[in-house]
Amino acid sequence: DEIGDAAKKLGDASYAFAKEVDCNNGIFLQAPGKFQPLEALKXIXKHXV
């Protein structure tokens, strides 16, 4: 089905990146702080352009 095909494509494309993430890094244990949607969108737009 289309969803399964898309999921496989996404998994294949992201696997190399996901392997490089150190899940034992202490940063993942820290609280993210106050979420600011506008600031998040600015950061995403800055990296996407």
From Swiss-Prot:
Binds 12 peridinin and 2 chlorophyll a molecules per monomer. One of its GO terms (molecular function) is chlorophyll binding. The keyword Plastid applies. It holds the Pfam family PCP. GO terms for cellular component: chloroplast; light-harvesting complex. Gene3D superfamilies: Peridinin-chlorophyll A binding. Keywords: Chlorophyll, Chloroplast, Chromophore, Light-harvesting polypeptide, Plastid. InterPro entries: Peridinin-chlorophyll-bd_prot, Peridinin-chlorophyll-bd_sf. It is found in: Plastid, Chloroplast. The keyword Plastid applies. Monomer. Water-soluble antenna for capture of solar energy in the blue-green range. Peridinin is an asymmetric carotenoid. This is Peridinin-chlorophyll a-binding protein.
